[in-house]
A protein has these predicted regions:
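Transmembrane catalytic cores of multi-pass membrane glycosyltransferases
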Residues: 68, 80, 85, 213-313
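Membrane-interface transmembrane helices that cradle and orient dolichyl/undecaprenyl
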Residues: 180-197, 304-312
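Membrane-interface alpha helices of multi-pass inner-membrane proteins
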Residues: 56, 159-163, 197-213, 251-256, ...
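Short hydrophobic alpha-helices at membrane interfaces in multi-pass membrane enzymes
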Residues: 188-206, 242-247, 317-324
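Membrane-proximal, lumen/periplasm-facing interface regions of secretory-pathway glyco-
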Residues: 361-410, 422-424, 428-430, 440-442, ...
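Short periplasmic/luminal acceptor-recognition loop of GT-C membrane glycosyltransferases, typified by
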Residues: 408-446, 466, 470-477, 503
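Transmembrane-helix motifs of polytopic, lipid-linked glycan transferases
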Residues: 125-145
Length: 525
């Protein structure tokens, strides 16, 4: 039973009943706090700590050295300067003028505004804020499905730990957040039949389509809900009626068209999904390496999902298809491990039997803990000295900050030849067209392969047309190409530090890139 009887005795009262306290001379003891209050205080403390810890761990190792954030910042700056959305590439010499869709334009603009006001700290503010939002949303999803507070708290914490490697300043944090929103709505509607919550989904997708291309994953989840309704027309206990879910999916597809590129964004999503070279060459797109605890967490969560689904009397169609989709996506690419994480949160929370926690805090109470957690994280950032100076020092250990300072001081010109990882930072810092950067979909498999061949010093490296025409080569000091250029009489070493080497043509006369006459110059001040 969940209710307490009048005969229940608290531990404090049992102590009062000891022989010493029962003597006639003993003074009456004050009545102890009622048990419900102590339980709710414990829940409040546990919830607040849950909200703080994931973002605190990020702040402990916070860095602004993410490779891709820099070309996003440059895109946001261009949008702010021109009050327009780019439709052609402006940043790479190899793809200058080709059609390009900045599908994360809203993310880029948001982060540029934060950077403009707060400097490198703005990047940390975005990331920590999104981690807090994801944690709160995930806990709300789990609480709606799991009646045991302790199980819900531990499960949410485990999911947050699993996604730890994704806590970097990327637009996929929005995708994780919106996916949790979507799954929360779908699971609650399936459980309660309250269809009005479905009205939130088109608005979510309209925003989603302007911050990250992986809104496609959200549409797949909606498609799974529709499939369940089609396959269980005679069952209504755990499905959404066919007409509402079909209209919701249609409305969400229409909502995604409210972006600067219209339906063309679906072609971009298709091209990215079927680009095999990127999944083999780009580390974050490769399969899980199982060298980190979060990798094994994904595996253990998937085992747990199989166990709870297998013991069901009747195969739960939505949960089973959701798990299958999550397994395919997450084990294909480590960047998408979040799909299995949030799918496991929903599946396990709704299927693990726990003790119903009496005296639970009101549903709205979690919102009261958010500002407390935010204030604690702000204080933690000061205590950990998370400031622009510290972030700059950390960034200089990963990105060629000093080498680029020398290149700008000496007025070295392009074309620039660089590797894949550093291209985004060069776009931001040098304001010269780069040879390649983190936009794998724009450059295509052929360019990615050509760059890898050159940088690893494989046969034919010296025939790379972009290397031949380079006016400046910025190279990791330990890269195979760097050692080859030291011996190449066509290049001379202009600068070197512990991280980067800077080469220029030995004859001192680089060939400048030709820009299409109908395009603005890529250098914009």
């Amino acid at each position: 039973m969940d209710t307490c009887t009048d005969q229940s005795v608290s531990p404090e009262e049992s102590l009062d009943a000891s022989p010493a306290s029962a003597s006639p001379a003993a003074k009456p003891q004050p009545r102890s706090e009622p048990q419900p209050r102590s339980e709710q205080i414990a829940q409040a403390i546990g919830t607040t700590l849950l909200y703080i810890v994931p973002a605190f761990v990020y702040l402990r190792f916070a860095s602004a050295a993410d490779f891709d954030i820099w070309w996003h910042l440059r895109t946001g700056q261009w949008i702010a300067q021109h009050h327009a959305i780019p439709h052609v590439d402006l940043f790479s010499s190899a793809t200058m003028g080709r059609p390009w869709e900045a599908y994360s334009w809203l993310f880029a603009l948001l982060n540029f505004q934060l950077f403009q006001r707060l400097g490198l700290s703005g990047i940390v503010v975005y990331t920590a804020g999104m981690i807090l939002a994801i944690t709160v949303a995930l806990h709300h999803l789990v609480k709606r499905l799991q009646q045991d507070f302790s199980i819900g708290l531990l499960l949410t914490g485990a999911i947050c730990l699993t996604m730890g490697r994704l806590y970097v300043p990327r637009p996929w944090l929005f995708t994780i957040l919106f996916s949790v929103f979507e799954l929360n709505i779908l699971m609650h509607v399936r459980k309660t039949g309250r269809l009005r919550e479905l009205l939130w989904l088109p608005a979510i997708f309209a925003l989603w389509a302007n911050v990250h291309i992986q809104f496609i994953d959200g549409l797949v989840i909606l498609g799974i809900a529709l499939t369940e309704s089609l396959l269980t027309l005679r069952r209504t206990a755990t499905r959404i009626p066919l007409r509402p879910i079909a209209l919701t999916l249609f409305g969400c597809v229409l909502a995604t068209l409210l972006n600067p590129y219209g339906w063309h964004i679906y072609k971009t999503a298709h091209d990215l999904a079927v680009q095999p070279g990127a999944f083999n060459l780009v580390s974050e797109l490769q399969a899980l390496p199982f060298r980190d605890i979060s990798d094994f967490s994904v595996l253990f969560l998937s085992f747990a999902c199989v166990a709870v689904l297998a013991r069901s009397r009747r195969l739960p169609i939505f949960e089973s298809l959701l798990f299958l989709f999550a397994a395919i996506v997450s084990f294909r690419s480590q960047r998408d491990l979040w799909v299995m994480a949030i799918a496991a949160a929903a599946i396990l929370a709704s299927n693990i039997t726990g003790r119903k926690t009496p005296h639970r805090l009101p549903a709205f109470s979690s919102l009261l803990f958010v500002p407390v957690a935010a204030a604690a994280l702000l204080l933690a950032s000061f205590a950990l000295h998370v400031n622009n100076a510290r972030l700059s020092a950390r960034m200089a250990k990963t990105l060629p900050v000093r080498a680029l300072a020398v290149a700008k001081a000496r007025n070295y010109s392009g074309p620039v030849y660089n590797n894949y990882d550093w291209g985004g930072y060069l776009i931001w810092e040098l304001r010269l067209p780069v040879s390649i950067d983190g936009r794998a979909g724009l450059h295509g498999d052929e360019r990615l392969h050509r760059s890898r061949v050159t940088w690893t010093g494989e046969p034919g490296w010296a025939t790379d047309p972009q290397l031949i025409r380079a006016g400046m080569v910025i190279a990791p000091v330990k890269a195979p190409l760097t050692q080859l250029l030291r011996l190449d009489p066509k290049f001379k070493l202009a600068y070197q530090d512990d991280l980067a080497a800077l080469f220029i043509p030995a004859n001192g006369r680089p060939i400048l890139p030709m820009l299409p006459p109908d395009l603005p110059p890529p250098v914009m001040h």
